[in-house]
Amino acid sequence: MKDRFSLVAIAMAGALSSCGVPAPSLSLLSAECDVQFSSGDVVRSQDVFFMASSMADCRKPELRFAPFRSNALSYGFVTPKGSEDEPWKTHDAKLLRKSDWVETLLRQVARPGANKELLVFIHGYRNDFHDGLQRAVTVRNLYPYAVPTVSIVWPSRKRYLGYIYDASSIGWAQAHIDRLLRTLVQGTDNITLVAHSMGGRALIGAVERLNLEDEAAASRIRKIILVSPDVDRDRVLRDKGSVEALLHGGRSVTIYSSHEDFPLRTSRRLHGYSRLGSSDCRYSVNYEERDRGRYGECHLGPDLPGLSIVETSDAASGGFNRHSDVFDTCIGRADLKAVLTDEPTPWRERVEPRDGRTGYRLTRAAYEAERGDCPD
């Protein structure tokens, strides 16, 4: 049933891609955004910074972002406005001038208690400004202390059938993300990059370019985490593949994959070969592995220092989508927290190595035996 739905979705996405994206309305284009600007002096430690290449929508008192591309980049911050129990249920976004944004962010990084760390999050397919913010907050809250956080927002159409639009837009946004990363590495020497889904494409591209342009600055990126990355698996894990660039300079690189990820199954049908965020063997470039089937654990990668590739299928979040299990389950968040804070991960099992390639799997039973809590 899922496979039939996947084929229908692909056919409809292909048909819709020929329609093109309509132009923004005149009211959106002419809306005045000056009233949305604030000052960096009011930014608090719990606020989240953002850089958006989506078009700012200033037609209402609340700042929003429309699913259109904009070369007029928006820099700003978001303040939680919800209750004490659910502070991020509602929020207030404000713009900053770029120079004020950079200065305020670096001041937050340098403040006592922040450990001079910076977290950068890139959202994925079918996620808008709000979705990206919520994921960034989920990751940020796993730290035991307040870490300055930047949510990078690119113009997703936020539709199941908008896959081709989104794939095109993340490629279009690449140059903007590259430039932002070059700015950020000048101000701190301890950066963690986290990307979800299609966001992994931009993360990998930005790191590869920065390695080539400024190796010393690139070394300030200490950790890279790819959650359900919608990227060609062989391109990353093969000999001399992108994983070597990601690990360059002694970085820690963690990749989460699953054989239950439905959007990545659809992506594989569009691209023809396995995705990095999938452990399914049936469409591997290593053709002899294909007989291992869907459950053959083909997420294994080269045995390199700093690299962990983790199969997450046992971290079931419910429903059929399963594209965000790492964020949506207790064991997924616990493992992510351990990576962020350099803690042990006793709930991981090491997969039997094959041809010099290694990896892990999450085991819910081991987690429940080890811990009874659920990281927020």
Identify the residue ranges that each predicted region occupies.
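Bacterial N-terminal signal peptides that target proteins for export
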Residues: 1-8
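Processing junctions and N-termini across compartments
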Residues: 10-13, 368
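C-terminal motif of bacterial Sec signal peptides marking the signal peptidase cleavage site
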Residues: 15-18
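Lipolytic serine-hydrolase domain surface
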Residues: 20-114, 127, 133-149, 153-189, ...
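Alpha/beta-hydrolase fold active-site loops
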Residues: 117
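The conserved beta1-alpha1 loop
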Residues: 120-124, 196
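Gly/Ala-rich beta-loop-alpha elbow adjacent to hydrolase catalytic centers
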Residues: 177, 195, 199, 203
